UniProtKB/Swiss-Prot annotation:
Function description: Cell wall formation. Adds enolpyruvyl to UDP-N-acetylglucosamine.
Subcellular location as annotated: Cytoplasm
Top-rank taxon: Bacteria
Residues forming the catalytic site: 118 (proton donor)
Organism: Fusobacterium nucleatum subsp. nucleatum (strain ATCC 25586 / DSM 15643 / BCRC 10681 / CIP 101130 / JCM 8532 / KCTC 2640 / LMG 13131 / VPI 4355)
Protein name: UDP-N-acetylglucosamine 1-carboxyvinyltransferase
Residues annotated as binding phosphoenolpyruvate: 23-24
NCBIfam families: murA, PRK09369.1
Family affiliation: Belongs to the EPSP synthase family. MurA subfamily.
Length: 423
């Protein structure tokens, strides 16, 4: 038996949605507690399946993890019990591969299973491994495991990433903070989540300059100090909630946002005719859905339009009069939600990496299946708009990235229920 959402859509929903802490910040920051012994307290941690998966992985490596409340954790690092991350845990989530950088920093070696996770494209770890090699690690891959070893610890080096990979940037930063000498990382990813990781490590005493730019300079230090830290809000959850608000003519206020983390997304929505009122961390939509006009979107590394908001944006474009386009440049296979939206009455055609979306009046209710986390969110939004009963299967994907999704939308008046199904 698996879980699904039964949604009776077409209802009026209104109220306020508060954005949770960032999953994509929490994962690397939790992993960064491997880098130095001590007691850490992390706040604004989202209550998600991926976080629970990571807790099990950290505990398997010898860390003590205590949940203080729904969104706070205490992590005690008294030294690792081993430097091997097994396939059983790593296969559940790609971010698990980030433990390699932390293990190299503290243990000078690491052995990690090649990762599993989402069904979106290849997502190779080659860039991570090139980075480790540039810092003096020897890499050996066999039997589905990557083993990295060093003679006497890592040594600073110059690294140019072929692509600004978020995961590779994070893994290399963690490995380099205690390496001997200076590391220069060019073409680094610039996502807010990278900044958050850097700020956490800087609070611990790491010497990192160029934070928020594509060129990071890291002067290795011998010792860091464990600290308390508050995670930034999740910009992808924020974007999803803002799209929900537009779909319902601005009846949902969104709080807990960082507007500068959403610049390209908000600019694109403004180009489509959306007007906002932003006060501090609160955003209100002042436009009706029917007033929007079509647009073209190309997903890009930050600060461009985020690939993680591509599928929720597509749901919105399905109900905008005229023809819109989305070009996906980050991941292959990231249009798996398209056949499902088409089942709900959308008119979307795919040509290679571009989706052409012709607006329709509304979605029709249907049974659909989430293929990944963001696709799941896009289908739920469509089902909330559609008149009648829809079933969204495989919602375990959604639980990986959205905290208490159904409870939050129920509080707005949505008719959404978690049920068990055979599918």
């Amino acid at each position: 038996m698996v879980e699904a959402f039964k949604i009776i859509g077409g209802k009026k929903i209104a109220g306020e949605l508060k954005v949770d802490g960032s999953k994509n910040s929490t994962l690397p920051i939790m992993i960064a507690t491997l880098v130095e012994k001590g007691t850490y307290v992390l706040r604004n941690v989202p209550d998600l399946r991926d976080i629970r998966t990571l807790v099990a992985l950290l505990e398997s490596l010898g860390l003590e993890v205590e949940k203080l409340d729904a969104n706070s954790y205490k992590i005690i690092n008294n030294g690792l019990s081993g430097a091997e991350a097994s396939y059983d845990l790593v296969k559940k989530m790609r971010a698990s591969f980030l433990v390699m950088g932390g293990m190299l920093a503290i243990e000078k070696r690491g052995k990690v299973a090649l990762p599993g996770g989402c069904a979106i494209g290849a997502r190779p770890v080659d860039l991570h491994l090139k980075g480790f090699e540039a810092l003096g690690a020897k890499i050996n891959i066999e039997h589905g495991y990557v083993e990295a070893t060093t003679e006497n610890g890592l040594i600073g080096g110059n690294i140019v990433l072929d692509f600004p990979s978020v995961g590779a940037t994070e893994n290399i930063i963690m490995a380099a903070v205690k390496a001997k000498g200076k590391t220069v990382l060019e073409n680094a990813a610039k996502e807010p989540e990278i900044e958050d990781l850097c700020n956490f490590l800087i609070k611990m005493g790491a010497k990192i300059s160029g934070v928020g730019t594509s060129r990071l300079e890291i002067d290795g230090v011998d010792k860091l100090t464990a600290c308390e830290y508050t995670i930034i809000p999740d910009r992808i959850v924020a974007g999803t909630y803002i799209i929900a608000s537009i779909l319902f003519d601005g009846s949902i206020k969104v709080s807990g946002i960082v507007p500068e983390h959403l610049s390209s997304f908000l600019l694109k929505l403004e180009e489509m005719g959306t007007k906002f009122k932003i006060e501090g961390d609160k955003l209100e939509v002042l436009t009706k859905l029917s007033d929007l006009k079509p647009a073209k979107v190309t997903t890009m590394p930050h600060p461009g339009f985020p690939t993680d908001l591509q599928s929720p944006m597509m749901t919105l474009m399905c109900l905008v009069n005229g023809t819109s386009e989305i070009k996906e440049t980050i991941f292959e296979n990231r249009f798996m939600h398209v056949p499902e939206l088409n089942r709900m009455g959308a008119k979307i055609e795919i040509d290679s990496s571009t989706a052409k979306i012709t607006g329709v009046e509304n979605f029709s209710s249907a049974e659909v299946m989430a293929s990944d986390l963001r696709a799941g969110a896009s289908l739920i939004l469509a089902a909330l708009k559609a008149n009648g009963e829809s079933l969204v299967n495989r919602i375990y994907h959604v639980d990986r990235g959205y905290e208490n999704f159904e409870e939050k939308f129920k509080a707005l008046g949505a008719n959404i229920e978690r049920i068990k199904t055979e599918a």
